[in-house]
Design a protein with these regions (language model features):
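Enzymes that bind and transform nitrogen-containing heteroaromatic metabolites
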Residues: 1-178
């Protein structure tokens, strides 16, 4: 499945489909804790793919009838990444691509719920804009997450493939690097 957050859907209206290579498109999952997902979002297109919206029992939304609505708790104002992965696993999804923005990726990273992190560096200077990945502050550098990584050149861009699997725990709490 491919997963994204409501911010990315509202900002970019992604299709979340496979287009540049052959192969089937994955199921689409949107995290929408407050019921803000428009029924016209392209991620909800009725094209035979399974579509899920992860929300809360309190959230009011008007989703198409064939979209699976999964109500999850949000004890700290957000749905916990570990709860999201558990709910998806219960529904048969064991490989998840998080194609979200900085907020969604940051929350999964901080919770220790990522096996891999791909960071693309492009030779462009944007200046001011939305923040990138943000994590809780650390007191010392030895508390930082450090992951083995591979570097791939993609034309003018560089992809950093960071292996976080050694720092991922079953309960979703990241281990410190050693």
């Amino acid at each position: 499945a491919v997963l994204t957050g409501i911010g990315t859907v509202k900002d970019d209206d992604p299709q979340l489909t496979v287009r540049r290579v052959s192969g089937p498109s994955p199921a689409r999952v949107v995290i929408d804790p407050n019921g803000r997902l428009p029924a016209t979002a392209r991620a909800l297109n009725a094209d035979g793919l399974r579509r899920l919206v992860l929300t809360t029992a309190e959230a009011q939304s008007s989703l198409p009838a064939d979209v699976e609505r999964v109500a999850l708790p949000k004890p700290d104002g957000q749905i916990a990444p570990a709860a999201i992965l558990a709910a998806l696993a219960e529904r048969g999804f064991h490989r998840i691509l998080i194609e979200g923005g900085a907020d969604t990726v940051s929350r999964f990273l901080a919770a220790g719920c990522l096996d891999r992190l791909h960071v693309v560096i492009a030779p462009i200077i944007i200046g001011a804009g939305p923040p990138g990945i943000t994590l809780p502050p650390i007191a010392r550098i030895d508390q930082a997450l450090r992951a083995p990584m591979r570097v791939h050149e993609l034309g003018e861009e560089v992809l950093l493939d960071c292996d976080l699997s050694a720092q991922r725990l079953a309960v979703g709490v990241a281990k410190k690097s050693t």
